Amino acid sequence: MTATIKLGQLAEFLGATLSGDGEKEITGLATLQEAGPAQLSFLANPQYRKYLVDCQAGAVLLKAADAEAYAGDALVVADPYLAYARISHLFDPKPKAQAGVHPSAVIAADAQVDPAASIGPFAVIESGARIAAGVTIGAHCFIGARCEIGEGGWLAPRVTLYHDVRIGKRVVIQSGAVLGGEGFGFANEKGVWQKIAQIGGVTIGDDVEIGVNTAIDRGALADTVIGNGVKLDNQIQIAHNVQVGDHTAMAACVGISGSTKIGKHCMLAGGVGLVGHIDICDNVFLTGMTMVTHSITEPGAYSSGTAMQPAAEWRKSAARIRQLDDLARRLRQLEKRVGDVTPGGNASSDG
């Protein structure tokens, strides 16, 4: 069902300054290029300012400086992107689950399910699990023994929680995610791998989001821990005993090896990899495809790898990289020879 909200109501909801017709009805959100007369748009990135001229949106979320030059209706806010984020939930068409248990769900006799929770078709909830009020568990979810899901949690269809996974309040988990799978732990005995039982669990804080097909392994001894407000994209691998600090965000395909600790307010771009048993301090930004091989103790942005080039140029660069050892050796020899004939023996490049 499409929501219809008056522009004045949206201004009140945001605490925004209304410039225009407060009675105008808004039925959805769209980009500056695509928005129609009943839709709200926003300008967050200056590179899209050029689209304001021909924008057909019913209204636009704008900063004060941009609103001065805009002839159409606007909601003036300090941060248009944040305002868009808040309003987006008012127009979200995602169906709302009704409280209750579907007849096909299988629930252990000693599991505790709050009457205000929604349990979907063919869900399985094992012994000792506790499901709080307002939780939605989608079709075909598996909730293992002694798991706990806090108030307001939302599990899409086909989420798997192995035993002893504890989840905080308002956590969102997308389809295919697996929490509490066995960590990759083996001891080598004369070339033969002997399995190590993974007897820890997984602890997830409040307001966490976990993307499609992301895996968070259980701890070998203590729990794997994900802090409050952490946001995890799709297809992320978090190994056993990893600790992730509050409000850290990770894009798709990040891989974190066992026992690594990541601080608060970090950002890991797509494809980042981290070796095990290292510490990353707070407020670190790792750019895409960065390979982290040692601890980071200073906040800031870090990168590794090579950026894209035209293929022919990249091949030349790769060939030069293979020659670096030889070039360094020849440079040392040249410096030595220059030093032998330079008064005072100074052959450094800065004189």
UniProtKB/Swiss-Prot annotation:
GO terms for cellular component: membrane. It catalyses: a UDP-3-O-[(3R)-3-hydroxyacyl]-alpha-D-glucosamine + a (3R)-hydroxyacyl-[ACP] = a UDP-2-N,3-O-bis[(3R)-3-hydroxyacyl]-alpha-D-glucosamine + holo-[ACP] + H(+). Keywords: Acyltransferase, Lipid A biosynthesis, Lipid biosynthesis, Lipid metabolism, Repeat, Transferase. The active site is at 240 (proton acceptor). One of its GO terms (biological process) is lipid A biosynthetic process. Its EC number is 2.3.1.191. InterPro entries: Hexapep, Hexapep_transf_CS, LpxD, Trimer_LpxA-like_sf, UDP_GlcNAc_AcTrfase_non-rep. It comes from the Bacteria. Homotrimer. Belongs to the transferase hexapeptide repeat family. LpxD subfamily. Catalyzes the N-acylation of UDP-3-O-acylglucosamine using 3-hydroxyacyl-ACP as the acyl donor. Is involved in the biosynthesis of lipid A, a phosphorylated glycolipid that anchors the lipopolysaccharide to the outer membrane of the cell. This is UDP-3-O-acylglucosamine N-acyltransferase.
